[in-house]
């Protein structure tokens, strides 16, 4: 176990709660100490949800430690069942309940005797999986539970829908731009003449889950949530699964062609080539923009990418393949699925990083000095310290990346949003230099601290004055080169003379 003050993917119970609270009329009960119950605040603040977060904490306190938990947990489940009348109550274990070795399965069986709704124990091992894996497992567990229940009662619908239809699997609360992506995917499916059979878990009722096998295919837009459910439906009912992420012009077209292949194999007769062509040329501005002089100015510029598998892989491909930007390294914090990530991005970047250590990522950014960073909220903090612009492309994110306006990342409108994000993330030409020449609130003192908190060097007054004269868009690079030169030569104080010597040494 490792003590961390920053985690890219949260603990397992957060994933379970994200899935449970995405469904309509499902209540979650978390068996945890106070301190693990921050999910309620996080959901209402970040997602700006209007409804009350349906999560109750069954607090592990000194009385529980003395007498055991059964009485308290069972009482909480039956009380919430009577008060809220949920269709399903999910009991979520936590690290604490695992340490105490509580028999939660027994608690659920006991509570089920009195509860009118269904009660389910989330089957996740807190010490083996993180938020993303737990969310995937919980969604699969809930879907399987209700399909098996319908099968036992003989209520499972026969056959497929009359028209081609799709289940969109993996849209959840607190997901990165999930609601906007869902709207865009529905619009895309309508354009293709495909009905949406279900969207899960966001906004779905557990009673609708028995209808999932009626769809012609399942679309899983995010690799982190939904693959287990889709493979279960494929194994049980033969429903094909499409897991191509429709992000960027090339991948969106590839996804649509795969949809065409899948539904034509089931008796449809569609050809989407004309639609793809029209969208690429006229609706999405990304293809046109990539040929414009603005985009050509970005050709060869250095960038780094870090995030979850889905977004980091997609952005790496878009930057390299569609916009001609040099991706120095691409990374992911999804260590459990590292092989897939390597396979996807290795030909589009110089180096692949697989790590959950934000310090390692910060140092890697400082080492390569990119023109722009594309990452999570943490990489934005790193970018601010190093004075490198950052576009946020993946969770974890703060409230400003839950936009109120329509900003999908998927589909053809998503390509426009991503293109804007990429272009606006790079510092334009002489912008910094001009601001410094003409003054204004944007002028700023030189920040002499690097990514590492401890620094063995100090700048003298004349050294700083000389550094201030250097244009802003190259100042950071000059500063880092000078500090490297000073360390190599054993200087402790950097004066103007040391700066001149460093410039001569690198031929500047």
Curated annotation (Swiss-Prot):
Kindly state which keywords UniProt assigns to this record, in alphabetical order. 4Fe-4S, ATP-binding, Chlorophyll biosynthesis, Iron, Iron-sulfur, Metal-binding, Nucleotide-binding, Oxidoreductase, Photosynthesis
Residues bound to [4Fe-4S] cluster: 36
Q: Name one GO biological process term.
A: photosynthesis, dark reaction
Short name of one Pfam family: Oxidored_nitro
Reaction(s) catalysed by this chain, per the record, are: chlorophyllide a + oxidized 2[4Fe-4S]-[ferredoxin] + 2 ADP + 2 phosphate = protochlorophyllide a + reduced 2[4Fe-4S]-[ferredoxin] + 2 ATP + 2 H2O
The first-level EC class reads oxidoreductase
Q: List the disulfide bonds.
A: none
The catalytic residues are: 294
Which pathway does UniProt place it in? Porphyrin-containing compound metabolism; chlorophyll biosynthesis (light-independent)
Annotated cofactor note: Binds 1 [4Fe-4S] cluster per heterodimer. The cluster is bound at the heterodimer interface by residues from both subunits.
Residue numbers binding substrate = 429-430
Q: Does the keyword Metal-binding apply?
A: yes
* Superkingdom classification of source: Bacteria
GO molecular function annotations of the record: 4 iron, 4 sulfur cluster binding; ATP binding; metal ion binding; oxidoreductase activity, acting on iron-sulfur proteins as donors; oxidoreductase activity, acting on the CH-CH group of donors, iron-sulfur protein as acceptor
UniProt cofactor(s): [4Fe-4S] cluster
Write the Enzyme Commission number(s) for this entry.
1.3.7.7
Q: What does this protein do?
A: Component of the dark-operative protochlorophyllide reductase (DPOR) that uses Mg-ATP and reduced ferredoxin to reduce ring D of protochlorophyllide (Pchlide) to form chlorophyllide a (Chlide). This reaction is light-independent. The NB-protein (ChlN-ChlB) is the catalytic component of the complex.
The similarity comment for this entry is:
Belongs to the ChlB/BchB/BchZ family.
Subunit comment for this entry? Protochlorophyllide reductase is composed of three subunits; ChlL, ChlN and ChlB. Forms a heterotetramer of two ChlB and two ChlN subunits.
Q: Which PANTHER family match?
A: LIGHT-INDEPENDENT PROTOCHLOROPHYLLIDE REDUCTASE SUBUNIT B (PTHR33712:SF7)
Name this protein carries in UniProt: Light-independent protochlorophyllide reductase subunit B
């Amino acid at each position: 176990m490792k003590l961390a003050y920053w985690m890219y993917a949260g603990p397992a119970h957060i994933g379970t709660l994200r899935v449970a609270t995405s469904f309509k009329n499902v209540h979650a009960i978390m068996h945890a100490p106070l301190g693990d119950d921050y999910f309620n605040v996080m959901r209402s603040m970040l997602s700006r949800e209007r409804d009350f977060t349906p999560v109750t904490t069954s607090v592990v306190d000194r009385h529980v430690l003395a007498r055991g938990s059964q009485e308290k947990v069972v009482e909480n489940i039956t009380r919430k069942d009577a008060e809220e009348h949920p269709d399903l109550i999910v009991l979520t274990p936590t690290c604490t309940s695992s340490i105490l070795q509580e028999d939660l399965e027994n608690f659920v069986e006991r509570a089920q005797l009195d509860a009118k709704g269904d009660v389910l124990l989330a089957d996740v091992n807190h010490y083996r999986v993180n938020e993303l894996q737990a969310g995937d497992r919980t969604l699969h567990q809930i879907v399987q539970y209700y399909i098996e229940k319908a099968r036992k009662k003989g209520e499972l619908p026969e056959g497929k829908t009359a028209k081609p239809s799709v289940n969109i699997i993996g849209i959840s609360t607190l997901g990165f731009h999930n609601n906007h992506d869902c709207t865009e995917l529905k619009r895309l499916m309508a354009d293709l003449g495909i009905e949406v059979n279900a969207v899960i878990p966001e906004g779905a009722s557990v009673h609708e889950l028995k209808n999932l096998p009626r769809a012609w295919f399942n679309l899983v837009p995010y690799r982190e949530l939904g693959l287990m459910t889709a493979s279960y439906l494929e194994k049980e009912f033969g429903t094909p699964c499409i897991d191509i992420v429709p992000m960027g012009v090339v991948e969106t077209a590839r996804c649509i062609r795969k949809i065409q292949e899948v539904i034509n194999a089931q008796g449809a007769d569609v050809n989407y080539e004309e639609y793809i062509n029209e969208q690429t040329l006229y609706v999405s501005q990304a293809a046109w923009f990539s040929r414009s002089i603005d985009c050509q100015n970005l050709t060869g510029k250095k960038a780094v990418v870090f995030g979850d598998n889905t977004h980091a892989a997609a952005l790496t491909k878009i930057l390299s393949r569609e916009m001609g930007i040099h991706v120095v390294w691409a990374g992911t914090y999804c260590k459990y699925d590292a092989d897939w990530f390597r396979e996807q991005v290795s030909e589009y970047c110089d180096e692949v990083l697989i790590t959950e250590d934000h310090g390692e990522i910060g140092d890697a950014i400082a080492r390569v000095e990119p023109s722009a960073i594309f990452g999570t909220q943490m990489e934005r903090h790193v970018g601010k310290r190093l004075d490198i612009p950052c576009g946020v492309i993946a969770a974890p994110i703060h409230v400003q990346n839950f936009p109120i306006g329509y900003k999908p990342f998927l589909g053809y409108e998503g390509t426009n949003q991503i293109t804007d994000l990429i272009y606006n993330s790079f510092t334009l030409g002489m912008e910094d230099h001009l601001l410094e020449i003409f003054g204004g609130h944007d002028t700023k003192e030189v920040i002499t601290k690097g990514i590492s908190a401890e620094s063995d060097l100090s700048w003298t007054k004349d050294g700083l004055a000389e550094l201030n004269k250097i244009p802003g868009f190259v100042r950071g690079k000059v500063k880092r080169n000078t500090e490297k030169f000073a360390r190599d030569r054993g200087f402790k104080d950097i004066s103007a003379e040391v700066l001149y010597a460093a410039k001569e040494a690198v031929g500047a």
